[in-house]
Amino acid sequence: MANTALIGCTGMVGSFILNNLLAHPSVARVDTISRRTPQAASAAQTKLTTIVSDDTSRWASELSSLTPTPSIFFSAFATTRASAGGFENQYKIEHGLNVEMARAARDAGTKVYVLISSAGADKNAYFAYPRMKAEIEEDVKALGFERTVILRPGLIAGQREESRPMEAAIRCIAGFAGKIHSGLKDGWAQEADVIARAAVNAGLKALEGDVPTGSEKVWVLGGSDIIKYGAGSKN
């Protein structure tokens, strides 16, 4: 049985990760750290402990003090340029907090780290956002977890709480393409619940050492891998 912790639990993918962890028979405990109280499935609330704080500078110490120590730490934490008030602040928040929390998890003894990244992550990219995503990946890999799992989804299909008109239009196209044939969508867009199931399944496999050959330390899942590991019953 795995003890787990999660940040980003109120976002589109993170909320699905939380519900999948709560429903999974191999998960004994779920701790979340967030600015808002997550909307979790009430049926499995006995597994769930929530820490809610607007002061993100306290999150790392909260994570360090968790008992028992989470064996798997999941991060679906992200923000936007608009909500952060510009890219410089977005970088400080998204890169800074992700790396700080990963370091705290490693120092506490967490064995497996699971990150929701992006298909476009590239340290040599022209645009700042994919460079930031790549830098988060590289910095958490350098921490030397027993195993690091990185998911690189394409467009994340599903309903967001906040308004992103351009992204919403593209999600509509993805949804229409998926209704015609899943193959028209799966290569460049994945449903949020599928990404979440893939993250949970891959994290648990990594904890057991059941990872593909050559991915013993770092396991990167692209779009087709996310579809593969996110398929099946919805917990």
From Swiss-Prot:
GO terms for cellular component: mitochondrial outer membrane. InterPro entries: Epimerase_deHydtase, NAD(P)-bd_dom_sf. It is a peripheral membrane protein. Residues 1-36 form a transit peptide. SUPFAM superfamilies: NAD(P)-binding Rossmann-fold domains. Coiled coil: none annotated. The keyword Membrane applies. Its main location: mitochondrion. Pfam families: Epimerase. GO terms for biological process: import into nucleus. It comes from the Eukaryota. This is Protein fmp52-1, mitochondrial. It comes from Aspergillus oryzae (strain ATCC 42149 / RIB 40).
